[in-house]
Amino acid sequence: MIGHVRGRVQSIEPGGINVDVPGALVRGVGGTGAAVHGELVVAVHDPGEELRAGAIDVGATGKIVVGGSRASAETLTRARAMGVAGIVLGGVLDKELRDFEAIQRRRREVGGLSGSFGVLLLEGFGKVGIDPQRFAWLKGHAGSMASLFGADGLLYVYDAEVAPGRRTLPRVGERVIAHRRPFQGRAGVLVAELDDLHATPSGIQVRMGLVRFEDGRLAPVPLANLEATLPVPPA
């Protein structure tokens, strides 16, 4: 049995074991596929760049590849065929993910699949760039060993300092990330909390915050759709 995680066993329970992992945990918003492990590599130059099929070659075999804003079904299929262990993305289009999973089911039915493969989404669904703060941290740990749990939306990077964190209920003045359209995946600063309740496009009355996004746009966003980004603590 392969556990795909490295660490010290703390306890054994019916149906599983608890392991203390010497590294940093990055939580995504979702994912798919099996648990995998491999060396972390970055295949894009910019967190908003799309991961193209041409960026996947034999050098990526057995590795966990960090992409950018999305990957097509063609790119995911090529990565799977080349023996890539896993893919980390800001987001992915629902249709692309469904098409990829349909291809995998057909290949599995005819016995054409071997090994495991996982996909982790860090920011959301659709074309969503990785938060630059997170991307810089991942890039700084290229070459480290990592374990990816696609279905659980988790990435462990071994022997790494604490990753940039997130917190709900952001406060005025904090850097935030939006998690719903039309601003999904975009970063900015919460400059004010609006008084009273305000209606969303769907008609629901919610508390809103005023966010100045990094492109200079000022927009109201439901506070429930925002997370504060926490800086990496000094070593």
Predicted segments, located by residue:
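Conserved anion-binding
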Residues: 105-130
